[in-house]
Amino acid sequence: MAAPGGRGRSLSGLLPAQTSLEYALLDAVTQQEKDSLVYQYLQKVDGWEQDLSVPEFPEGLEWLNTEEPISVYKDLCGKIVVLDFFTYCCINCIHLLPDLHALEHTYSDKDGLLIIGVHSAKFPNEKVLDNIKSAVLRYNITHPMVNDADASLWQELEVSCWPTLVILGPRGNMLFSLIGEGHKDKLFLYTSIALKYYKDRGQIRDNKIGIKLYKDSLPPSPLLFPGKVTVDQVTDRLVIADTGHHRILVVWKNGQIQYSIGGPNPGRKDGIFSESTFNSPQGVAIMNNIIYVADTENHLIRKIDLEAEKVSTVAGIGIQGTDKEGGAKGEQQPISSPWDVVFGTSGSEVQRGDILWIAMAGTHQIWALLLDSGKLPKKNELTKGTCLRFAGSGNEENRNNAYPHKAGFAQPSGLSLASEDPWSCLFVADSESSTVRTVSLKDGAVKHLVGGERDPMNLFAFGDVDGVGINAKLQHPLGVTWDKKRNLLYVADSYNHKIKVVDPKTKNCTTLAGTGDTNNVTSSSFTESTFNEPGGLCIGENGELLYVADTNNHQIKVMDLETKMVSVLPIFRSENAVVDGPFLVEKQKTLPKLPKSAPSIRLSPVTACAGQTLQFKLRLDLPSGSKLTEGVSSCWFLTAEGNEWLLQGQIAAGDIENISSQPTISLQIPDDCLSLEAIVSVSVFLYYCSADSSACMMKAILFSQPLQITDTQQGCIAPVELRYVF
């Protein structure tokens, strides 16, 4: 197919015909009617004398997840292509990703469909390829992506907002556009009928596109894009949202892990720690051995009980909500992308902790979850478990107002509480307006503190300027924390790669640490140390230390507010890890030789497809009264002799610390399968003592799981229970 001779035309050329189609679809009742209408529409636009042709990708653009740059009129010939115009800071763009993931799992390039992300930056920081690489990893983007830093394609097509999807036919001809989020049904309808229409005409090709996933180059690290961190003021433990590993860590102040809950893969499951899963958790708050978690991409608030070692859901239904008022009981109340949480109080008692304040980034609001019956300002008595909007209209704005429901936020992403007078407020890092705002705990009034612009609709007033009030400029701040000792507010000025400090009395905002460079430097001087998109921070050690989630450096940085030194908190397990610089390197567990007496159990074959996760649940019973030997690590190993590619990048060994709470072993089938048959083995070695400790012994067992891999989409795979009584 030859490239069109003329310049590509804008999306406005599609508007009349597609608008008529969408009005007709409103009146369609059956799926057959809808399919027919879309088919007729394609006949119409395909018959136009001149295609609405997309321009070629400009030369010299930076590509990710591909072996080489992609050409519209060479590589994409014979494909239905979905162009996703997005920017990685945008919550609406993030909301769209699950729809694209679902589409990728339904149709592959062999079926004739390809998705290409066209990154068109809002903030200057988002034009930098390294920062986009971090976003690709953080959001598990596996389709090809191009960094259109100058927004050339955006301007050629006259795209107007993020996100926008443009669906192309096999000649690079524009067929449909979808603006904003929430169009999953239309996306699937349009792409499925387009594939059928052009297959009927023999114009779809099944050639594969050269994919090379950037995530395969990621080095091992104890943390992966940690989003938030908080301190248990009673024990000085830290709670870390290890966002990229989809888990919550509870660590002692020396960095030793006490609990690891969830991970390494995303999921949505309550229960005991070894079985519970999260999906890109962000905000965390801890009090009395209870942790509340903003489970962002699950659209849930989760509760972790450290004493019972269980996880439960207290708000949200597991899918993105659109309700902007709320008022239902937590588990029945849909919510949208909660990004941070902080404890508050409904009465005059300071720090009673009967309210959980929520930065609801997805609906641009501040919500409240009642942990006990109580009252909010200007509200009647509310029952325990009620989850509702407190401030924000739901419009994406930088609007301050004495009436909380008339105020507007723009993706609030960080919260901190100053309950004492004269402050008595929530501090809010309002990321998309590049401001810090306050919400009064007495009447809900929303006020400006620093950053941004007076025009409530101007969300482009960002920069890196120390100053007072509106003269100070921030760039997409994601975190705030209140220093009660000094009456100062610390701000994670994320896209400026700095930590700033604000005096709320004078509204003076100055740089505390960071140079603005994204190098990973620790120093005896705050001003010489560097950060890379820090996402969260908290005060610890009675106001002496500031802990920073240095997100893109995959670290927790420790800032000593007295000595002005910056260091890295090592994250390690007590005996099974050593620290080598910023990365944790697990001591390589060596698979012991199985004793001849060890039973070998061959399981029934399991069928799975690429991308699915197979779970093995250990269910081993010791003789009555026996207990695991203290000081000796009972352990498990995952092997795949002759098919080691199955285990690449997976956790292939681990400890068994408690016989009453045995781990679940996860194996995700890689997207690129080198064989359709394999045998996966689980070897278990248990060291235990009899009830009276008169005899201690080691027992082992081998489970062999035949695996058949298919390219046909499978339903949910039931966990495989590995049972044996010793």
Swiss-Prot record:
It is found in: Cytoplasm, Cytosol. Ubiquitous. Detected in heart, kidney, muscle, brain, lung, liver and in skin fibroblasts (at protein level). Its main location: cytoplasm. InterPro entries: 6-blade_b-propeller_TolB-like (IPR011042), NHL2_NHL_rpt_dom (IPR045302), NHL_repeat (IPR001258), Thioredoxin-like_fold (IPR012336), Thioredoxin-like_sf (IPR036249), Thioredoxin_domain (IPR013766). NHL repeats lie at residues 212-254, 265-307, 335-369, 409-439, 461-505, 518-562. GO terms for cellular component: cytosol; extracellular region; platelet alpha granule lumen. Keywords: Cytoplasm, Disease variant, Neurodegeneration, Repeat. It holds the Pfam family NHL. PROSITE patterns: NHL, THIOREDOXIN_2. It is linked to Fibrosis, neurodegeneration, and cerebral angiomatosis: An autosomal recessive, early-onset and fatal disorder clinically characterized by progressive cerebropulmonary symptoms, malabsorption, progressive growth failure, recurrent infections, chronic hemolytic anemia and transient liver dysfunction. Death occurs in the first years of life due to respiratory failure. Monomer. This is NHL repeat-containing protein 2.
